[in-house]
């Protein structure tokens, strides 16, 4: 696991769903081919994930490492927003493999453009 600069994140070629600009105060973590941008503005822990390179490492162990990083840095909730299969895969990974006592906090729907589910997942 490595902490990367926001400039590194901003230099990555990403698709439309993950083309988010990192700003001062955000945190970028790189674990086994996957980059995590933790947006910290207004104390929200919105996380954007991007697969930088194909990895043979198990996705569950990558998320376990990421959760350990969250616990060490006192990030208690992650905000997951989106729609479609990738959104639900990430939600299910965080929920299914979360430590005992953690899990789904709550969910709301809001968006004029499309149905967008916003979930807050407790990390520990």
Which residue stretches match the model-derived regions?
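Conserved beta-strand-loop-alpha-helix junction that forms the acyl-donor binding cleft
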Residues: 79-91
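Conserved catalytic-core motifs of GNAT/GCN5-like acyltransferases
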Residues: 98-118
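Short, aromatic/basic amphipathic alpha-helical patches
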Residues: 88-100
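Short amphipathic alpha-helix that is part of the acyltransferase structural core
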Residues: 1-19
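A conserved beta-strand-loop-helix scaffold within acyl/acetyltransferase catalytic domains
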Residues: 17-44
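Short, high-confidence coil segments that cap the C-terminus of an alpha-helix
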Residues: 72-75
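Conserved acetyl-CoA binding element of GNAT-fold acetyltransferases
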Residues: 41-54
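Conserved acetyl-CoA-binding loop-helix of GNAT-fold acetyltransferases
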Residues: 55-68
């Amino acid at each position: 696991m490595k902490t990367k600069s926001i400039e590194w994140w901003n230099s990555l070629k990403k698709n439309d769903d993950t083309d988010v600009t990192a700003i001062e105060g955000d945190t970028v973590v790189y674990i086994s081919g996957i980059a995590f941008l933790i947006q910290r503005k207004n104390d929200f822990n919105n996380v954007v994930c991007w697969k930088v390179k194909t990895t043979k490492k198990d996705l569950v162990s990558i998320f376990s490492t990421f959760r350990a990083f969250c616990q060490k840095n006192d990030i208690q909730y992650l905000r997951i927003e989106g729609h479609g299969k990738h959104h639900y895969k990430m939600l299910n990974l965080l929920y299914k493999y979360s430590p005992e006592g953690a899990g789904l906090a709550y969910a709301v729907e809001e968006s004029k453009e499309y149905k967008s589910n916003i979930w807050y997942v407790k990390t520990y």
